Amino acid sequence: MTNRYTTLFANLEKRNEGAFIPFVTIGDPNKALSFEIIDTLVSSGADALELGIPFSDPLADGPTIQEANIRALESGITPKDCFDILTKIRAKYPHIPIGLLLYANLVYANGIENFYQKCLDAGVDSILIADVPAHESKEFRDIAKKVGIAQIFIAPPDASESTLKQISELGSGYTYLLSRVGVTGTETAANMPVEDVLTKLREYNAPKPVLGFGISKPEQVQQAIKAGAAGAISGSATVKIIQNNISNKQKMLNELTYFVKEMKAATLN
């Protein structure tokens, strides 16, 4: 099992910082530019990456990320291209944790063990399967353990204590804490209070909780860290910058740089 997450969180804790983790879809808007985008996110200060593999029916995603999936698929991106990009990123950045956020069908289509092995070979540290809750995850979990990849679970804000306990016991890497129920996107802003859930996760010794869903502003990152989260994930807001600058690559990369720097600065206590 890679220990990049453990190392990252320990280093951030020493420096009294939280993690800023941007999400983008691999291959959006095309293979060549996708590598440059991910490269820009890391060089601008992202602490870890959360990446999607394009899928035709992303159920948990709002319109922004659905459109990113469509752009990537229409550009002709294949799963092999996605693994090529991951391998290049890992070669350039040996220490950054890389997580994949995807759907069960994509994993099944490749055979679970084969897919996890490919991910490991490409330098992936963790896999979160958005449509598989912890209590249905045994076949994925067992293979993740065997292959040496962290299986990430989502903790919804309305989760029962027994669900939170299960997530804490079964998960590794980090815990993806939802700031609210619903689909992803900055269309609906993140609403705290997640303090109670964070307290429970700490009590159950869960992998470090990172807050996601609707995180688009530095002050939301600050609030998340103040509430006790180890970091924040921002997907739709990052992807919107790509969407809004499709025809102007330099402006897109400049805006992504500014956005990551600003969000990362908000994690400093």
Curated annotation (Swiss-Prot):
The keyword Amino-acid biosynthesis applies. It is an enzyme of class 4 (lyase). One of its GO terms (molecular function) is tryptophan synthase activity. InterPro entries: Aldolase_TIM, RibuloseP-bd_barrel, Trp_synthase_alpha_AS, Trp_synthase_suA. CDD domains: Tryptophan_synthase_alpha. Disulfide bonds: none annotated. Its EC number is 4.2.1.20. GO terms for cellular component: cytosol. Keywords: Amino-acid biosynthesis, Aromatic amino acid biosynthesis, Lyase, Tryptophan biosynthesis. It comes from the Bacteria. Belongs to the TrpA family. Tetramer of two alpha and two beta chains. The alpha subunit is responsible for the aldol cleavage of indoleglycerol phosphate to indole and glyceraldehyde 3-phosphate. This is Tryptophan synthase alpha chain. The lineage of its organism: Bacteria, Pseudomonadati, Pseudomonadota, Gammaproteobacteria, Thiotrichales.
